[in-house]
A protein has these predicted regions:
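NAD(P)H dinucleotide-binding glycine-rich loop of Rossmann-like/cofactor-binding domains
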Residues: 138-143, 150, 178-263, 310
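C-terminal hydrophobic helical "lid"/dimerization subdomain
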Residues: 34-56, 339, 354, 399-478
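Adenosine-nucleotide cofactor-binding segment
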Residues: 277-351
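Rossmann-fold NAD(P)-binding glycine/threonine-rich loop
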Residues: 372-386
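Helix-to-beta-strand junctions that scaffold the AdoMet/dcAdoMet cofactor pocket
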Residues: 360-361
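A short N-terminal beta-strand-loop micro-motif at the entrance of redox/enzyme domains
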Residues: 36-53, 68-106, 144-147, 162-163
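Glycine-rich beta-strand-centered segment in the early N-terminal region that forms part
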Residues: 91-108, 121-184, 223
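Hydrophobic/small residue at the entry helix of a nucleotide-binding pocket
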Residues: 240, 268, 351
């Protein structure tokens, strides 16, 4: 199946009572994946791994094209990812020359998986169909099932003929910037590439599976001191926070800058807090409970605002914002640090953007992504232009930024934010926890890894970094 003509094989749908042929294929696929897992667990060489058969199908979490209307008329908060995320066998795609087959040991839940599962703001099959029209290799993605997931750690099994820097047996993590490195628009900043996509959201064959196909320029070395699940939970949120806070493409934080961080105990917020602290800044973290405030202080953030205790109501009603509440937030920030923040780390979107623009310092900036509470944004432009503030958009990270962020994880300078772990069979429960904001940090998912705690190759360095630091969120989430 490698480097051949692409085939657009129909996926194996989850149906009761599989046909004898489908049942045989499933048994063969399970045996092949079991052999792969055994080989990885026994420390097989790269040559031995390369000699193993790639199964015709593999277990994956996916949504179905014929179910995209299942939530019609249902409020977003009432949509249950457990009903739309299926775990079953799907057909293995052919391998493009610039890709690798990856045995996925662990993955993680991100908001884009929640969006995919509730088909908001629109079903992702439109993304897959558009990719399918671009090339023969793109056509593989246009299926009636969408395998989701934008984080992964695992082991390279096979490499395409154009892959130079990776080989079977390499232990890797995966960042989600899916871009054609032969596209000239990708070479100033690949996030500006005309064909830039997020893997597992705007492409098929994502990381919530036992197997994946991944572009070689998505691969990064797995941190040797972390487990599979700890390694898998970082790339999307850590790289996003790095670009928003550190990179010259977005935040470009300086030593001494104050940064207001919404959702500071969450996925990207927890990484942002660490980057501000490491860079000599002053984080002001906004959280939603005393427990999360305590967790944030455990990261080293001294200045914390519990928004529920404060009772901010930035919207007087569905259509009207309340400037008095913006001012109250500004006073609370100044009471903590004595001034307005130079940077506001903004990702909730509609619910907070008006307040973010208001509280940013004169000449400061609001760095924004995601808009998880709503993407139709309102703010008072007078507070922007009259005080020379700026709004800077940021979307994930380019390869260099993702690599730098991953290096800081590998050096023990940034810690994983894993708070809970589910098996792949419970991916719906994991996505529901994120949808309902029930989990701090990141929610991990075990794929091929049979249990937590596996994959540590440098126990000595792990001890140097400190078990308490690495597992802070995990212990809090237990």
């Amino acid at each position: 199946m490698e480097d051949g003509a692409a085939r657009n094989v129909a996926p194996v749908h989850p149906r009761p009572g599989p046909t004898p042929k489908a049942a045989r294929e499933r048994r063969v696929g399970c045996r092949a994946m079991h052999e792969i897992l055994q080989a990885i667990g026994s420390g097989a060489s790269g040559d031995d791994l390369a000699a193993l058969s790639i199964p015709e199908s593999y277990r994956a979490a996916f949504v179905r094209r014929d179910e995209t209307g299942m939530w019609d008329g249902v409020e977003s908060t009432d949509k249950d990812p457990r009903k739309s995320l299926h775990v079953d066998e799907v057909a293995t795609p052919d391998l493009a020359p610039d890709e690798v087959y990856l045995a996925v040991m662990a993955s993680a839940i991100n908001f884009n998986t929640v969006w995919t599962s509730i088909f908001e703001p629109l079903p992702t099959f439109g993304f897959l169909d558009r990719l399918g029209r671009e090339s023969v290799w793109g056509a593989r993605h246009a299926r009636d099932t969408h395998v989701v997931g934008s984080d992964a750690s695992g082991v390279v099994l096979r490499v395409g003929s154009a892959v130079r820097n990776w080989k079977p047996g390499d232990k890797v993590t995966v960042h989600c910037n899916h871009v054609d490195d032969q596209d000239p628009t990708a070479h100033d900043d690949s996030m500006l590439a005309t064909n830039q996509r997020i893997w597992g959201f705007e492409t098929n064959f994502g990381g919530l599976a036992d197997l994946s196909v991944v572009k070689a320029n998505q691969l990064m070395p797995k941190p040797a001191h972390l487990t599979w699940e700890e390694s898998a939970c970082n790339a999307l949120c850590n790289s996003t926070a790095y670009r928003m806070i550190v990179s010259s493409h977005a935040g470009a934080m300086k030593q001494g800058d104050a940064v207001l961080i919404w959702g500071a105990s969450g996925g990207i917020g927890g990484y942002a807090t660490q980057y501000v602290l490491n860079g000599g800044g002053t984080p002001v973290g906004v959280v939603s409970s005393p427990e999360r405030a305590e967790l944030l202080r455990g990261l080293g953030c001294e200045h914390v605002i519990d928004r529920r205790e404060a009772g901010y109501k930035f919207w007087a009603d569905e259509n009207t914002q309340d400037e008095k509440e913006w001012r109250r937030l500004g006073k609370d920030v100044r009471a903590l640090i004595g001034r307005d923040p130079e940077i506001v780390f903004e990702h909730p979107g509609r619910s907070t953007m008006g307040a973010s623009v208001f509280v940013a310092a004169r000449g400061g900036k609001v760095v924004t992504c995601a808009a998880t509470s709503g993407y139709l944004i309102e703010y008072d432009n007078r507070h922007l232009w009259m005080k020379l503030k700026s709004i800077v958009s940021s979307h994930f990270a380019n390869y260099r930024e993702a690599w730098a962020a991953n290096r800081l994880i590998s050096e023990g300078k940034i810690q994983p934010l894993l708070s809970r772990v589910h098996p792949l069979t419970e991916v719906g429960d994991a996505a529901l926890a994120v949808h309902r904001n029930e989990a701090e940090g990141k929610v991990g998912v075990l794929c091929l890894a049979p249990e937590e705690g596996l994959g540590i190759d440098d126990a000595e360095f792990r001890e140097q970094v400190g078990e308490d630091r690495i597992t802070l969120f995990r212990r809090h989430g237990s």
